């Protein structure tokens, strides 16, 4: 029963992309971004509707494979040895090979190939390792599939960048009768273009939070662009939702969460930093107060000792040593 199997797999597969996304941002030092990116990406209206139970579609894994490929490319760039670079390149190729089985869009292969080569170049990996890694990547995704990537990308752009209705001419009895037919993609609800506010509303109901997360992500990208390069193909698809088809909203949603997560992490780290500084400042103040008190006590005892000594001599009393010396002198005088 394929329908029953698909229905039971949806709750598991639709949220599976959270794992590689969380690992990705944990490796680059922004774990909260991975957490919120996964949560908002899962429960965004645009993706939640397309991966609901009962709707058996390829969308349930269309986020998992791109994020997994991005994670493996990131690990290839961070690898310490040439052997690990090649292993992660093979892993990225195999993940996209499986993606072709799941969702036959060869353009993904070409896009991630360019990202892999550029990321390794930015990380200053040896040219030999880049060359071998690229070869293994192409070998794993299947060379014939890779060679058809440019044609797939061209067809994709033609489908999603036609904004005007096309016209067709029909010839009847040697006469030409013009007839206008609508663009087929405009008749599909998920391929329709929606306003920018509606795009954000299908991610989070609060548009202000959407804008904050969207701008925050680009702020994060300015500082950490090298480690975010493997996510560029997925981000490009997400940005298409503003101009082309609303089906790409599901690719944009995780980036809103990533931006909000980065701001949240900055806020939490800032609060802990202020608390730590406040505690350290109090410790310094306490030590200074204790030192002054100790110094005041020492000064007080010194004053008491001086005062007692002065009072002792003022009353005509001498210390025991002085009195004994005078007595000894008197005895010696008498005996003499």
What do these predicted ranges mean?
Residues 314, 333-336:
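Extracytoplasmic
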Residues 145-154, 161-230:
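Alpha-helical transmembrane segments at the extracellular/periplasmic loop-to-helix junctions
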Residues 281-289, 297-303, 309-326:
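Short, low-complexity, charge-dense intrinsically disordered segments
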Residues 237-276:
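Hydrophobic/aromatic-rich transmembrane helices and adjacent perimembrane loops
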Residues 99, 134-159:
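Membrane-lumen/periplasm interface segments of specific transmembrane helices
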Residues 2, 6-120, 235-238, 336:
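Membrane-embedded helix bundles of polyisoprenyl
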Residues 78-80, 86, 108-138, 266-273, ...:
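Perimembrane helix-loop-helix junctions
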Residues 124-131, 201-233, 270, 277-280, ...:
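Membrane-interface helix-loop-helix junctions at transmembrane boundaries of multi-pass membrane enzymes
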